[in-house]
Amino acid sequence: MAFETFSVALDKDKTLIFETGKIARQASGAVLVKMNETWVFSSACAASLSEAVDFLPFRVDYQEKFSSAGRTSGGFLKREGRPSEREILVSRLMDRSLRPSFPNRLMQDIQVLSYVWSYDGKTLPDPLAICGASAALAISEVPQNCIVAGVRVGLVGGKWVINPTRDELSASKLDLVMAGTASAVLMIEGHCDFLTEEQVLEAIAFGQTYIAKICDAIEAWQKAIGKQKNFSAVLDMPEDVQNVVSDFIREKFEKALSFRDKEALEQASKELEESVIANLVQEENSDFSLLNVKAAFKTAKSNQMRALIQDLGIRVDGRTTTEIRPISIETPFLPRTHGSCLFTRGETQSMAVCTLGGENMAQRFEDLNGDGAARFYLQYFFPPFSVGEVGRIGSPGRREIGHGKLAEKALSHVLPETSRFPYIIRLESNITESNGSSSMASVCGGCLALMDAGVPIKAPVAGIAMGLILDRDQAIILSDISGIEDHLGDMDFKVAGTAKGITAFQMDIKIEGITHKIMEQALAQAKQGRSHILNLMTQVLASPKGTVSKYAPRIETMQINTSKIATVIGPGGKQIRQIIERSGAQVDINDDGVINIAASTQESINKAKELIEGLTGEVEVGKVYNGRVTSIATFGVFVEVLPGKEGLCHISELSKQKVDNISDFVKEGDKLAVKLLSINEKGQLKLSHKATLED
């Protein structure tokens, strides 16, 4: 393929440049996307499957090369290895944006790889990665139903900003990443400072205009240079197979839908599927293959569930479309943790635990912008027993990381300033039961655990997951969706926030986009559900506890002059290690001179403060010091009153009586109380022990 390029101007100094034909020419599709000096490369390749499967084997891997920012990994191994949390989150964003664009029953193994090759420290690469991956797929042989593009939207100074720079984003009240087609939205994810539903909708509409512009440009490029699409890899569903399967299960599945609990419904559904396979699969007839029959069974189940909702307004568990599952809350739940809550909504349960600590508990990370440390982080755990299964235990998967980060963003906007609450905060959400919406249960349980721990949050936060049944030109929004509604429905729209406004949101769909009107209805219904949940939460715990747990460490801060930081640290950290050893406290010094002292007892904190003040304090005339005799002369003794601050106590100032032999009165190394009488023009200190006796 010859070198080809096109560009899309989004705003001043924000032009997307797409290039192909120079790099990775053996890939099915390969595109380099540039904006300023940030360059992101994306490739798309597909392979035939050795056997047909009932899912789409599609994988996206995004990697940020440290060399792109002129850096090298700080670890022992300098080669990029396991993906970072950020790389996993961006990979998920790309996957969720692109997956709805593929035809149903596409029998290909598809891989998209994206690399940040150059990073200017200003232009954020994730929207470029979505656009580049979409363009690479568009010009490849991989079949798609639609063209996709992605953008980021910010709100800076009351104005919407497209693809905000890093500096603009730090000042923004909104961080929204969204993807869609030229006419509809496919994926959104973001967090914000208590924006209203109307503002979020306005932001999405703003971003959609730019998405349409990029999609139109990619589509024109595809028509001009794209390869022939391989639609032969898409399996059709024979109409008679679907009809036979639907007729076979109609009455039986209607009976199964009468079961109101998850376990009974799943068991009945499993037995029905086994019956369908045993009775309808025909080895001699390829139309009635195992793959086709199983796919038809899933479609038939979905259609019956939808019909129940559309015709009767009743869901599989008996609820109405706006009804929230029963909620129970127990806080505190665990006796020795700093804060805890057992939050149960229907058959979804989160045991949330809050742990408070000093600076050494911060979550360290390394990315293209340098090293950092998170003062608040939420870790989500989804053990297999939560859904009654046997499974792998180990490092978190992409789903766990994504769910945890969404809940973390939802709660981060209500946390107090560090100056008011200097603790590092770790939240963990242990999912002990799951039947849909476990990430939003993590938000609710996590919020209550924070309040139980005495974290002075600005307001309680609750979360809810919304679903969609889109059929017969009718859109039905479902509140607080269960697992089967997520699995068989068309949308999963999670919204979290306070009574005042939204703090986080995430939407994934399984169809080719939804309209502004549907999102407006979903957000309005989510607000009603959120208000209901918040009301139940505040009935149990109306406000944060006034004090932290007696089991939490005590933390105090003190301010020193920045010129004294080196004195406190000492050569090679010798001085600060001595302070930690002598006091038993954890001491952390910031570049601005703020010192955080954490310990299990107040005595340890007081000791650490005393030692630090001794190193950094300035001498005051008239103040009494418990000094140390450093040397003895015939005319007096030299006494160190503060580290590095030494003065002379003349022999006449040692006692009210005459002292003939100083060595008989005091020895080198002895402690001696002295009062600072004066400081001469040379900075020399005049001390008196006699004055302390007079006092």
Swiss-Prot record:
CDD domains in the record: KH-I_PNPase, RNase_PH_PNPase_1, RNase_PH_PNPase_2, S1_PNPase
Chief place where the protein resides: cytoplasm
GO biological process: mRNA catabolic process; RNA catabolic process; RNA processing
Domain S1 motif, first and last residues per copy: 622-690
Listed SUPFAM superfamilies: Eukaryotic type KH-domain (KH-domain type I), Nucleic acid-binding proteins, Polynucleotide phosphorylase/guanosine pentaphosphate synthase (PNPase/GPSI), domain 3, Ribonuclease PH domain 2-like, Ribosomal protein S5 domain 2-like
Cofactor(s) the protein needs: Mg(2+)
Residues at which Mg(2+) binds: D486, D492
Subcellular localization, as worded in the UniProt entry: Cytoplasm
This protein's name: Polyribonucleotide nucleotidyltransferase
Organism this protein belongs to: Chlamydia trachomatis serovar D (strain ATCC VR-885 / DSM 19411 / UW-3/Cx)
Gene behind the chain: pnp
